[in-house]
Amino acid sequence: MLSDIEIARAATLKPITEIAGRLNIPDESVLSYGHTIAKLDGEYLNSLSSKPRGKLVLVSAITPTPAGEGKTTTTVGLGDAFNRIGKKAVICLREPSLGPCFGVKGGAAGGGYAQVVPMERINLHFTGDFHAITSAHDLLAAMIDNHVHWGNEPVMDRNSITFRRVIDMNDRMLRNMVIGLGGKANGYPREGGFDISVASEVMAILCLASDLKDLRSRLERIIIGEDNDHNPVAAAKIKAAGAMTALLKDALQPNLVQTLEGNPALIHGGPFANIAHGCNSLIATKAALHLGDIAITEAGFGADLGAEKFFDIKCRQANLEPDAVVLVATIRALKMHGGVALADLKNENIAALETGFANLARHAENLAKFGVKTVVAINRFHSDTEAELDKLQDLCASIGLDSAVCTHFTDGGAGAEDLARKLSAILDAPKEDSFRLLYPDEMPLWKKIETIAKEIYRAGEVVPQGTVLKKLKSFEEQGFGDLPVCIAKTQSSFSADPKAKNAPTGHIFPIREVRLNAGAGFIVAISGNIMTMPGLPRHPAAENIDINEDNEIIGLA
């Protein structure tokens, strides 16, 4: 089989105006970035709010393993499948980050015959949204230190500055540093550091803002530190929000591309789900709901991270109600959760599959707590045996879950038609249950953290470390007690220990740090050793990326 990039390069892409035309978007609202990429005019999208809203489908997954699950691939394949059976579907994805693109994961445009294209441009730079977000974030960082340097009012406590710089790259050397060395002319010495851009509060703000006015208001609310009387200082106090908004004006408009089968895809925003809220932009999701019959979106990593944050943060803030969830699983990953080594996954192992099924069942139980109907998408690999596939479908049925074997990676949308039809039956039928959130706004912050950790991660005890409880009390006293919680933890386990596979229960779940993201509208609670600035692996994917003799990019997967 051809590589992802070879498949993408062989495709004949339609003009982006033709893709927009299928959604009845007028030409003057299509802001082209070449022939195959466009941004959609924000004013036009605002005008859609009075139109009927379609159905919302979330694609999530079991706990990820190195064996791979194929969540983005399934999202793309499902969108193509819906369109093949006569449903007007629009998919919504996050934009790839350069960090993982050159690190472990590689690109994030799907795979095989279920991709969004042009994949090279989408994976590398795209329309410059991440550059704009990084620039706006670091402009605020520069203005903070400049404000302190000149002693402007309000006078800030330089040791209280909480706003770090960002870059869209995996670089462990930038995590912690001393800045401002070299004498008074070069600033003032203090500890600082960088996070990856996808962990930026500005990224989260762009993805949760409803329009440009809301974006500016949220930027003003970013807490950057304290004054000398220990009162919180917001970005509005140093007059940074206006220039930041100017940098983000175009980036706020969602990007329109196409799948290999010529169906519309909105790709916009890119917060990670392990260190941020993990969902594409609200503006893109709402646009898809008004432009199509069905909007299909994905949330990062496993359902314990992406889906919970999609429900409790994005849906809470935007008053959205999902109509169905797809839980993506693979035989390979479930066998790995059942104790099989990566090198042995090609061998049939029914016993390990049965053991690892506990992970899928746990995610399904958690999703049921939100009142949303779930269908399992079994993303088939060539090494899967018929006996294993039959066993997994039987296991799903035994706990009341419908499932569909999907081959969209090799067959495109045709390979996900069974999944699309099963979802259509759910979407067309009256709801059996009502959507609900995991906790109410008025619940105390620590109780919210405990609720997520015990109800979703199945922790036995949640342990606050250091000044966590003191900070949470301070946040509540400052009027932020009604905010939802975004827990940053490893994506590799329900617990804080990435080595604890399958479905651990009764574990100790530590909270080592909490951060206030007042602009984004949530509290970040950091657990375990999760880093907001990743590092590169021993042999990063960047080693395999190059330009060939025809000036074409190679090695991008």
UniProtKB/Swiss-Prot annotation:
Pathway: One-carbon metabolism; tetrahydrofolate interconversion
GO molecular function: ATP binding; formate-tetrahydrofolate ligase activity
Positions of transmembrane segments: none
Statement: the UniProt record of this protein carries the keyword Manganese: no
The EC number(s) this enzyme carries: 6.3.4.3
The family this protein is said to belong to: Belongs to the formate--tetrahydrofolate ligase family.
Name of the protein: Formate--tetrahydrofolate ligase
Species for this entry: Zymomonas mobilis subsp. mobilis (strain ATCC 31821 / ZM4 / CP4)
Lineage: Bacteria, Pseudomonadati, Pseudomonadota, Alphaproteobacteria, Sphingomonadales
Gene: fhs
